[in-house]
Amino acid sequence: HGLLFDSKKFNLLMQDEKIDIIVWVTRGYSNAIRNPEMYGWVDTNGNQIKKVSVKKPLKNPCTDPLVIGTFTFKSAEMFKNSADRLIKRDYRVNGELYVDSCINDAVSLGYRCIIFEVDHYLCWGTPNELRTFEYWQSCFHKWESHPYSWDKDKWAFPKDRNPPTSLSKLELNDI
């Protein structure tokens, strides 16, 4: 995924010794609104996390904090303790273990977990989201006055594949 965030605000959270774990979130992401059962959701009191719900929306997918898959544990030990507890209780969602779920274990262990809301979020975690990103990447490359160019991008579209040339190649109901 790609995102824009306030680095000064993040640095202040990192310097706060009362905070142990930061869960990065966004709100109102269109694909999560359409498919809330595909995402993790955070129940909070202010910015403090009460619980994380994986694959089960809370109250309102339009406004509830959405886990974007970025977590900041201030120490490896905090992650290990939380993950070990999750594994020991064998808490799985659809047969899988999720870092999202391990935040509930961190809360139970007494770690102070807070959310950090990003300013803008772009996901390419599903095939259609990736194709949409590739389409716009191709457009910006072809736009002569745009600063983006595949030649300057080490993560550019693979040379052995052709990028999409129109939105019609996407499943428009998933955009």
Task: Describe the residue ranges of each PLM region.
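Conserved beta-loop-beta/alpha segment of the NTase-like Rossmann-fold superfamily
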Residues: H1-T44
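Catalytic-core segments of class I nucleotidyltransferases/pyrophosphorylases
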Residues: N47-L122, N128-W150
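A diffuse structural propensity rather than consistent per-protein peaks
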Residues: D6, Y98-V99, E171
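Intrinsic disorder/low-complexity segments enriched in polar/small residues
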Residues: D16-K18, Y135, L170-L172
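Terminal low-complexity segments of carbohydrate-biosynthetic enzymes
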Residues: H146-I175
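Short N-terminal helix-initiation segments at or just after the protein's N-terminus
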Residues: F10-Q15, K51, S149-K154
